[in-house]
Amino acid sequence: MSQAELNGELFTLERFPPNAEEEALQAWEAADEYLLQQVNDVDGLTLIFNDGFGALACALAERNPVSINDSFISELATRHNLRMNGIDEESVRFQDSLSPLPAAPALVLIKVPKQLALLEQQLRALREVVTPETRIIAAAKARDVHNSTLALFEKILGTTTTSLAWKKARLIHCVFTAPELADAPQTYSWKLDGTPWTIHNHANVFARSGLDIGARFFLQHLPSDLEGEIADLGCGNGVIGLQALAQNPNARVMFTDESHMAVASSRLNVERNLPDDIARCEFMVNNSLSGIEPDRFTAILCNPPFHQQHAITDHIAWQMFNDARRSLKYGGELYVVGNRHLDYFRKLKRAFGNCTTIATNNKFVILKATKVRKQR
């Protein structure tokens, strides 16, 4: 938790989910301050993209902005920080990056995302609604503003310039001039080796151009012939859950992720590759397994992320492991794949009281932990 002076006001801001071990990490950055210095002379509809923890939304709540984000956790963080500062949550309208944008905004503020493909998707969506009078300003750490970033703005929207660096942050100013632009596919797609399946990925999905090596290893060691419910936790494009659906014909599969684009990709991949099995599926945008009833799943399959935005962290994995233990039936099993150096074995042993190594190679390990009743 930290205090930030933004737009002439003092705000208390916190990263989300709150985590005592990461109190030193701020929920705002110089790029937020730099952006806010540019907006006081612009009135009208305001769109905010990729506001990680809601610093911009809190500072601009009086404008009733629209906050556009692929991350459900970022929405939860923004709502949390609005409440902490006594601001009505209804003052900000939330929508995901796949929903149509409001027309003719006066002001567009963009925090440049880590994934260039997501930025391209968002700029293409903006191209359909902005006007030459729309003030378009993006911001990032100076080290994250590359020639390729500027070229994308120039190609999709029009005339693009950059600011001087300030507190190691830089601004991108863009004027819409409607340059000629070829159409782009809505998703990236590739063939999954050893199957008849074509995998489709929206822009912000990890490994959108091919199967990542951790998932490839995990696919070789998934459980078969289970009954009940299986969860693909942190499903990404859903390739793990898709294989689980095929290998467990008497089970239901939940695909869940905090990314709207990930869950949309998972749904699309079931619809395109196993359409007859869609009735056995559930798709949920969620913060891990929050709100899921206890003792529900027979098995949970998980490849935990170890980044939150630009920060390296293990609290997401911890949350997933603890949520999995609560949500599994007694005797239910959590299967995890991860880089060897992350030491998930010790974490699972602590959370579950047991852990077994299923398989290992020179980079990854696959582990299994079982929910058992505590001995009295």
From Swiss-Prot:
Protein name (database record): Ribosomal RNA large subunit methyltransferase G
Disulfide bonds: none
Signal peptide: none
MF annotations from Gene Ontology: 23S rRNA (guanine(1835)-N(2))-methyltransferase activity; nucleic acid binding
The species this protein was found in: Klebsiella pneumoniae subsp. pneumoniae (strain ATCC 700721 / MGH 78578)
Function as written in the Swiss-Prot or TrEMBL entry: Specifically methylates the guanine in position 1835 (m2G1835) of 23S rRNA.
Cellular component, GO, one term: cytoplasm
Reaction(s) catalysed by this chain's protein: guanosine(1835) in 23S rRNA + S-adenosyl-L-methionine = N(2)-methylguanosine(1835) in 23S rRNA + S-adenosyl-L-homocysteine + H(+)
Localisation per UniProt entry: Cytoplasm
Record-listed E.C. numbers: 2.1.1.174
Family as reported in the entry's similarity comment: Belongs to the methyltransferase superfamily. RlmG family.
Pfam family, one: MTS
InterPro entries noted in UniProt: DNA_methylase_N6_adenine_CS (IPR002052), rRNA_m2G-MeTrfase_RlmG (IPR017237), RsmC/RlmG (IPR046977), SAM-dependent_MTases_sf (IPR029063), Small_mtfrase_dom (IPR007848)
Major enzyme class: transferase
Keywords from the named record: Cytoplasm, Methyltransferase, rRNA processing, S-adenosyl-L-methionine, Transferase
